[in-house]
Each structure stands twice: as C-alpha cells, then as structure tokens.
C-alpha cells in the first residue's frame, strides 16, 4: 500500500493544483481519470496492464516476474520491492520492541508515514500536508496518555521543531534571497517533536543535515 501512496499522492496533489489554477484564471478545469489511493487498480506504467492480486504480492511477485511486467515485459523498478522489504523489516522491528500495545500501534503508524514521506520527498521534494499534519496531531494524541513522552515535552517539541526550521528558513532567505527548504520540513520536524519530545530534536536535526 505504501508504494501506492508514494506513487499516487503527488499525482493527486498535482491534479488538485492544476484545477485550482484553472479556477483562479477562470478557465475550464482539466478533466482527469478518477484517481484515489483506492482506485483504479494498479497498472503497469508502460502498457497499462491491470495488475492482478497474484502479481501484487509484496516482494514475491516481483521476484516471480523477474522484475518485468507480465504483459509487455517492461522492467519494474526494484524500488517497489525495496519499499516493501523496508516496510516489512521496520514494522517487524516495531512490533518486536513494543509488542501488541498502544505504543506498538503508534510506532507502526509513525514508521509507515516516515517511509512514505522519505520516498515522496526523494521523488518530488514534497512533504504532503495530508501526511505531516495528521502525523503531528497523532503524536500529540498518543502522548496525551504519555505513550512515548509526557504531553508537555510533546507540545514543546512540536512548537520548537516548527520554529527551529522556520527561523533557519527566514534567516537564510533574508541573507541570500533564496529558499533553503520548504514548509513541509517545518511540519515534519514539528511532528517528530510531537511524537518523541523536544529532547530528540537536536540529534534529529544533526542527523538530517
């Protein structure tokens, strides 16, 4: 499912922007085939072949098909099984560490969101609000019960995470006239602060720089 999110969400956002621009210009909005995270069924980008359930088994289908579309034999990017393997390994690690608990459920949600954001950012340099903002509020909700840190540390972490990169952004822009990062980075660091508390922000900034 994360491969679907990584591939489709930026396309859905781009279509929304095109429609909004057309509306502002009082032009006719472009017409697109309906695209959501659920529909239509995944297809080969080369020939449009609809991928069956047997061809959509994580990792195994890619290996069985030898990395090629069953219809047109076009190469299927190895990144698809990479995302699937990474998701499986990190999900198993989260389950092993936290077990079948409230904290385990949160760790899985955080893991999946960060994987999706990492690959979307690598492809498009976008960090969608539709992931970062629910992630922020999700972290605060989990820490309402002190799941990963106390609520005060989570709230301070969210505020400090946003303001830290906001300050760097504006300092850099005033000094150079250029934008060094996007607002999505502010929201993502705020979300991480909301999940893990302000104490993790220095090491997070250091590792991501």
Describe every region a protein language model picked out.
Residues 1-3, 7, 91, 95-96, ...:
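Hydrophobic alpha-helical transmembrane segments
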Residues 2-7, 11, 74, 95-99, ...:
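Membrane-water interface at transmembrane helix exits
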Residues 3-79:
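Membrane-proximal soluble regions of multi-pass membrane proteins
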Residues 44, 87, 93:
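Zn2+-dependent cytidine deaminase-like catalytic core
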Residues 47, 99-100:
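Short, positively charged
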Residues 77-85, 129:
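Select subsegments of transmembrane alpha-helices in polytopic membrane proteins
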Residues 103-208:
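Functional transmembrane core segments of multi-pass inner-membrane proteins
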């Amino acid at each position: 499912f994360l491969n679907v999110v990584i591939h489709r969400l930026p396309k859905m956002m781009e279509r929304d922007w095109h429609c909004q621009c057309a509306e502002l210009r009082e032009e006719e909005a472009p017409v697109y085939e309906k695209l959501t995270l659920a529909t239509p069924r995944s297809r080969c980008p080369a020939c449009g072949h609809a991928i069956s359930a047997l061809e959509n088994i994580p990792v195994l289908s890619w290996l069985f098909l030898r990395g090629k579309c069953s219809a047109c034999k076009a190469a299927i990017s190895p990144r698809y099984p990479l995302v699937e393997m990474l998701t499986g390994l990190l999900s198993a690690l989260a389950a092993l560490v936290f077990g079948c608990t409230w904290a385990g459920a949160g760790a899985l949600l955080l893991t999946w969101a960060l994987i999706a954001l990492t690959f979307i950012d690598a492809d498009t340099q976008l960090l969608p609000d539709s992931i970062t903002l629910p992630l922020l509020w999700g972290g605060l909700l989990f820490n309402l019960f002190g799941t990963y840190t106390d609520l005060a540390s989570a709230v301070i972490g969210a505020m400090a995470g946003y303001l830290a990169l906001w300050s760097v952004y504006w300092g850099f822009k005033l000094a150079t006239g250029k934008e060094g990062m996007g607002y999505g980075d502010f929201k993502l660091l705020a979300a991480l602060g909301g999940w893990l508390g302000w104490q993790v922000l220095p090491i997070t900034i250091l590792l991501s720089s």
